[in-house]
UniProtKB/Swiss-Prot annotation:
Keywords, alphabetical: Repressor, Stress response, Transcription, Transcription regulation
Statement: the UniProt record of this protein carries the keyword Ubl conjugation: no
GO molecular function: DNA binding
Domain of life according to the entry: Bacteria
Pfam families: HrcA
Record protein name field: Heat-inducible transcription repressor HrcA
NCBIfam families, per database record: hrcA
Record has Cytoplasm as a keyword: no
Amino acid sequence: MGSRELSLRERQVLGIIIQSYVVTAAPVGSRYIARNYSLGLSDATIRNVMADLEDEGYIHQPHTSAGRIPTDLGYRYYVDLIMKVQRIDEDEKRRMETDYGQIAMEHPGTSRDVLLSAAKVLGCISRQLSVVLSPTLSDAVFERLDMVLLSSTRMMVILSIHSLFVKTIVMELPLEVSRKMIEEVSNVINERLAGLTLSEIRRSIAHRLAGSHGDGALKDLIVRSAGSLFDESPIFERLYISGTEYIVDQPEFKQPERVRELITMIEDKFSVARLVEKSGHMSEALRPSDMDVTISIGSENSTREAEDLTIVSTPYYAGNMVGRLGILGPKRMDYEHAVRVLNYMADSLTATLTDAN
């Protein structure tokens, strides 16, 4: 099925079916195409073309209608070989800059504000579920560590990393410490570890702190805790989601059971994060030519819960770290628009986090 190259006529009809279905959410018939598009083809000819497309698995007929709707294969052919992504238009660009650019100019204290803002703007503009996955931190460059004493046996450790990223951990202490002790140890850590990546610190912290000033017991505790202090945050803690109200308003989710299934999936932040993360490692076949964008459609997704969804994702950068932006929505998605706004937001987010260095 779908093994040969489609003719120009077949490509035109398939493109019209998908574009019309995206707008109307209604199956598309040959008469509709003949009346609304100047292809120079009769209703009968269009019907024959649609029959060929159906035989090859690009479209199919829902049991309740005489019209046709795209299959996963049809959408795949469309995004790979028919879709033309234009540059973002000026009105939309201004709207995104108004909503997001204000925060970028204010240079907020941490990455959390930036990433959450990006998710909200992307969800609002795309009218889909938007997902921002913060970068993995193995290659993140350590700037400084601050320790805040909460009680004599409890303290908060704050790791500051390049590009506004901050990691916070509360530690229970098996020994009593004073503010002077944590100040001395913090100074030693910052002097000896600043500028290293977190993975370098995990491998060499004991050697690098050997023979340094400061309370030995507290330094030993930091060394023993390096695996958690200087390690990745759990993937679900790296996830920022927005736009649930837009995706549940789509016709595909009118039935209460479908809405419940969707909300259950969204609330499982680990699963959503894994979906977006995996989309970045999928086959080159899922990337339209000349695009740094992955589009995973329906059955191409890694879980049953996402079989009726499309995931469009692209990387963004913060120094030498890589995060991922994604749009999740029904397969009946305006793919050109999704790719356009996703690329623009990725560029904006990269610029903001790069300027923060």
